[in-house]
C-alpha cells in the first residue's frame, strides 16, 4: 500500500498551475492570438510549460483555436461547436475524425515561420517524454516519493488540466452571462475563471480576442493576465495589446440597451409608470448613445487624418485636442450608462403572471 505524501499532493497543484499557464499564456494568448510579444527565453519557458500540458503542439492547438474563433458556433466549421452538444464540444470532437477538427494551417503562416514552434511540432513526442522525465523524476527524488509525484503530479494533473481546458470549449459556451455580445454563445463565468486561470471571461474574449486580458476589470480573477503583465515589467514581454476603454464601454452599453428592452417586454405590465413613456425614455437614451458613437467615429477619422499629415506640429496640437475630446465622450458614455441603469431599476422584475 502506498500513501501519497503531502509533497506529492502539493506537486500536483503546483504543476497543474505550471502546465495550465503554459496553455493560457503561451498556446492561447501568445501564439493563437498574438496578444503580446515575448522574448525568446520566455517563449522557450512557455513552450516547455505548454508541452508539459500534453494538449498537442502549438501549431495544431493555435491553428484550431483560430478556426474556432473564425467560425464560432458553426456546426460544420467550428472544431468544437457547442451547437453539436456538450460532450462534442467538451471532448467528443477529438475522439473521431470529424472534418471540422482536421488541421488546416493556412490560417497560421506566422507559426509556420516560427522556428521554435516548428521545432516543437517536429519533435513533439520526444519533447513530451523529456519534459515529464525532467520535471517529475527530480521532484519525486527530492521529496522521496517518486511514485506519488508520477501519479499525482503526472497522471492526475493531466486529467485535471485537460478537463479544465475542455470546460472553456463546453461550459463557457453554455453557462454564464453575456455582458458584451450576444452574437455567439460565449459566456463570462467567474467560477470557471477561477478554474481556468482567467479564461472564464469568455464572452469578453470572443468579442475582443486580441486583448492580452480576459478579465478586463481590475477585480476580475485572471492570473494569466497578471503573469503576462509581470513578464512585461521584467523585460520578458512587450507590446501588450489592450482594447480601448471606449470600445469596451460601447459594447457593454449596447448590451444593456438590449437587456433593458427584453426586461420591459417581459415585466412591463408590472412597471409602476406608463409603459409607453418608459419605452420612449429608453429610445431617447439609445438615440443619445448612437449620437455619441457617431461623434466617436468622427474623432477617430480626425485622428487618422492628423497622423497622415506631414506636419509634426499639427499632429502634436491635434493629439492634445483629441485626447480631451475622447475623454469627454467617455464621460458621455458613463452618463448614458447611469441613465439606463436608473431606467432599468424602475422595471419591477416580478414573475410573469400566467
Predicted regions and their residues:
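Catalytic glutamate of the conserved HExxH
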Residues: 29, 170, 174, 206
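Generic hydrophobic/packing signal
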Residues: 24, 141, 170-172, 189, ...
